[in-house]
């Protein structure tokens, strides 16, 4: 004889695991961009905004490696230095990058509008809060100190250098879940503004929420975003939404201010016996009012 059974988690959301830059702090994820562009400018190989943003979400040494492997940058480096970038070059660049990144973090460390209201909403529902990042520990310590002084204190903070592999591997989110004491990964939501961050959450077996307006996929500072006309905002927002749909995000929101609607939507799915791996649930777009724009 053989037996098979299927378990469904039908309980509430227990934890939300946030990304940092572009999701909860630093609207537009500008600090990494400043640091990467400054780093390559010092090498006399300027990189574009698009080149700096493409690997966003990955661990920063890996981010540098991926930029160096871009065809245009690879050939520019060969022309400038007579050979392709070596492991020693990558290590040198990374050590030069760290202080640049820390300085940029200090300059850009402001909460995304709506963060504290959303945190208060989560706390009222006894939902635990964790966070992870592609920053290393020195970078993260600077950011968490600033955030704590402003009232944002995730109970678990994990950085890419704390685990064997960063995004898109699930290690950081799983470490967050362990530290938060979560009973089932299906009771967790990973919130991120990058596609590697969404892949991380999916690989961890969690629900995922993609963030468009405040994050890397739109890629504008708050001031530049505010200055756009409504038609331009719609185009950029819809382009970002489509990338998150293709990347498998379960729910897509504009910013952390919209997260309560996403949590309630996911809890309705859970009550119906659905899980993060249920076919056909990805790609729902929500507003703060909870209206589905799918």
UniProtKB/Swiss-Prot annotation:
Catalytic activity: phosphonoacetaldehyde + H2O = acetaldehyde + phosphate + H(+)
CDD domains membership: HAD_PHN (cd02586)
Keyword annotations of the record: Hydrolase, Magnesium, Metal-binding, Schiff base
Gene Ontology MF term list: magnesium ion binding; phosphoglycolate phosphatase activity; phosphonoacetaldehyde hydrolase activity
Binding site for Mg(2+): 19, 21, 193
Class in the EC hierarchy, top level: hydrolase
Active site: 19, 60
Pfam families named among the record's database cross-references: Hydrolase (PF00702)
Cellular compartments per GO CC: cytosol
Any GO BP: DNA repair
Database matches in HAMAP family: PhnX
Role of this protein: Involved in phosphonate degradation.
Record NCBIfam families: HAD-SF-IA-v3 (TIGR01509), phosphonatase (TIGR01422)
Subunit structure: Homodimer.
Protein name, entry field: Phosphonoacetaldehyde hydrolase
Organism of this sequence: Hahella chejuensis (strain KCTC 2396)
Lineage per the UniProt record: Bacteria, Pseudomonadati, Pseudomonadota, Gammaproteobacteria, Oceanospirillales
